[in-house]
Amino acid sequence: KLKSRKYSIVHINSPDKRGIDVALLYKTKYFSLLTTKSVNVIDTSDLEFKTRNLLVVTGILSNDTITFIINHWPSRRGGGKDEKRIVAANTARSVVDSLLKKNMNAKIILMGDFNDNPKDPSISKHLNAQPEKKLNDMALFNAMYNIHKKGYGTLSYQGIWNLFDQMILSKGLIDNKNEKYFYQKESASIFYKKWLINQEGQYTGAPFRAFSGSEYIGGY
């Protein structure tokens, strides 16, 4: 079924010690690839630290140029420190700044698993992703902020919902009615189906995971 849909991927091996990579899946019918770049996340105070790279992909979407920055920031597993995610945030911010320096109206979408919530300093301060749509030129808009504020998320831990999976947009995609693509207010959402949620047992109401530790349990 997927083969007939004509999907393609952008993938570059990352330095991550667990072998986890980031990738972009896209339909060739709608998106024409122009450039691909891998940006390593380097902690200068801990050069032995290895994590996922940032995948920077630019292409044409319906005659408009758009850049995707694909993220999978350092994990919280085993008490993973927020300083590592701040390093990732600063790295992503430097990529954004370099794009905006060339074109202040550049259309940029940062997406992926940030392993932090919208209010956490890595996102709100270091990446400068804000909830308000009244943005200065360099700020980004976090389309998922209000969703998390309402108590929704994509990860349940000890009964509390976290929203690590986020979509963050540059000003070039906000309220630009003269362009074909712009963000429509409150259009961001979390895909929800009953079969994605545990219906019984200890984790009733939490997402049905693919793995429990190293054991595959058949979820998503």
Predicted regions and their residues:
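Soluble non-cytosolic domains of exported or imported proteins
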Residues: 1, 16, 48-49, 79-90, ...
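Structured beta-strand-rich core segments of catalytic domains in phosphoester-bond hydrolases
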Residues: 2-65, 73
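Extracytoplasmic/secreted envelope proteins and their assembly/folding machinery
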Residues: 22, 86-89, 93-96, 123-124, ...
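Secondary-structure boundary elements
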Residues: 30-32, 59-67, 94-106
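Metal-dependent phosphoester-hydrolase catalytic domains
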Residues: 49, 98-107, 116-220
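Metal-dependent phosphoester/phosphodiester hydrolase catalytic core
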Residues: 62-94
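Active-site metal-binding loops of divalent metal-dependent hydrolases
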Residues: 73, 113-114
